[in-house]
Regions:
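Charge-rich, well-structured scaffold segments of protease-associated domains
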Residues: 28, 32-189, 212, 218, ...
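An N-terminal structural lobe/cap that precedes and organizes the functional/catalytic core
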Residues: 1-10, 29-32
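A short, flexible beta-alpha/helix-coil linker loop
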Residues: 6, 20-21, 55, 236
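Hydrophobic (often cysteine-bearing) scaffold residues that line and stabilize catalytic clefts
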Residues: 11-15, 69, 226
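Cytochrome P450
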Residues: 5-12, 103-107
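Active-site SXXK
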Residues: 14-25
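His/Glu-based metal-binding/catalytic segments typifying zinc-dependent metallopeptidases
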Residues: 2-7, 146, 153, 179-251, ...
Length: 387
């Protein structure tokens, strides 16, 4: 189940994270212990995750048990108690543990800081993690849940169930979910900015690699096709084991570089993440920046054709993966302003030409860059040194 209750919609900093960690605690009909025991007895797995736009509540189970888990998900959304003692004894400590774990994960920390710097911590720039410096009350969590947990804010997605079966479950189990209004967020405003922080491991030792993120405002989800192709064209990974890959970023020596595009409802971030020893990051960042500039000048039709094929594979994987309910792209298309099919999305990618990719790269470079530097910051570059 996807709920339109990501961090961009939260009424107070951290309440979206708190609701995520409240998932599968006591409801009006079931205690937290009963929920866990029944899931174990049925061989099921329950999980919750959070993005900037959505909260995901996922149940994985054996075929034949769908009625039980559909009832449970509906109860978690529609009849949650948000008990004070569970908040104080379980949720608050888990919030601190999540934040501490994220602080030790350079990728999680870097992406969160990048959005915060780019959007000044507002809307989509709101952190996915509650901060100890901004304490949350259980009353604030209840108030946000009352706004978010209603039928207008949820989408039910399944993998392995027929459409008719899913409709039947929705019409029987989810009638208990209260009616309400869909949450609305203020339009996103990109500012651009920088974040730099020394980063060590949990024991205070230097990490083997420093991390540098550079990004520009990208495109909204509805207009993301050219940038999705540009992301695939720049690449950074490999599709074949023991091969360095053919993309420009995969050719950078002594560093790992990867392009990314995080497309949201009304904005997006397109950028490159570099992981390398401190002394190698600056050169790798310059090479990556040159690759983006080269794409803005011109790209070959052959490269674009290859990138389109890669982008289409990634999109299909998002739509049809085994844990489809946990994919942002599916939830966004169901809960966004206009739903779209996989076929129409693939057609959009197929229509992208070389000129479209170059134009998209040119538009990026006209904007203000954002950057995040983690590690030995004295040796790490600034975005304005690269563009």
């Amino acid at each position: 189940m996807a709920v339109r209750a990501g961090s961009r919609f939260e009424s107070e900093a951290g309440v979206a994270h708190a609701i995520k960690n409240f998932a599968f605690k006591s409801t009006k009909d079931r205690s937290a212990l009963r929920i866990v025991r029944e899931a174990e007895l049925n061989g099921g797995v329950l999980s919750a995750s959070l993005s900037r736009e959505h909260l995901f509540l996922t149940a994985e189970f054996l075929k034949g048990d769908e009625a039980h888990f559909a009832d449970l998900l509906a109860e978690v959304v529609g009849n949650h108690k948000y008990c004070r003692h569970e908040f104080n004894e379980e949720v608050v400590p888990s919030l601190a543990a999540d934040a501490e774990q994220a602080a030790q994960d350079p990728v999680a920390l870097g992406v969160d800081a990048l959005f915060s710097a780019a959007y000044r911590g507002r809307g989509v720039g709101s952190s996915l993690f509650a901060s100890p410096s901004s304490p949350i009350t259980v009353e604030a969590v209840r108030a946000f849940a009352a706004q978010a947990m209603n039928a207008s804010n949820i989408a039910i997605v399944s993998s392995g169930l027929s459409q008719d079966k899913l409709r039947s479950l929705a019409s029987t189990s989810f009638v208990r979910v209260p009616a309400g209004s869909a949450l609305q967020a203020a339009p996103s405003k990109y500012f651009g900015g920088d974040y730099r922080a020394a980063l060590t491991d949990a024991h205070g030792h230097a990490l083997p690699n420093d991390h540098f993120f550079m990004a520009f405002e990208g495109a909204s989800r509805a207009n993301a096709a050219p940038l999705s192709v540009l992301e695939a064209l720049l690449g950074g990974g490999t599709s074949v084991k023991w091969s360095a890959g053919l993309s420009p970023l995969s050719q950078i020596r002594d560093a790992k570089a990867q392009a990314f595009h995080s497309a949201l409802e009304d904005t997006g971030l397109f950028g490159i993440h570099i992981a390398a020893p401190s002394a190698k990051v600056a050169d790798a960042a310059k090479t990556a920046a040159q690759a983006l500039k080269a794409a803005a000048d011109s790209v070959s039709s052959e490269d674009v054709q290859r990138a389109v094929a890669k982008a289409k594979f990634v999109l299909a994987q998002d739509f049809e993966g085994s844990r489809v309910a946990g994919h942002e792209s599916v939830a966004a298309r169901l809960l966004g302003s206009s739903a779209s099919s996989l076929e129409s999305e693939l057609d959009s990618l197929s229509s992208v030409k070389a000129a479209d990719v170059s134009s998209a790269a040119q538009a990026l470079l006209k904007g203000k860059p954002s950057s995040v530097a983690l590690g030995n910051v004295k040796q790490l570059p600034y975005a304005d040194e690269l563009f």
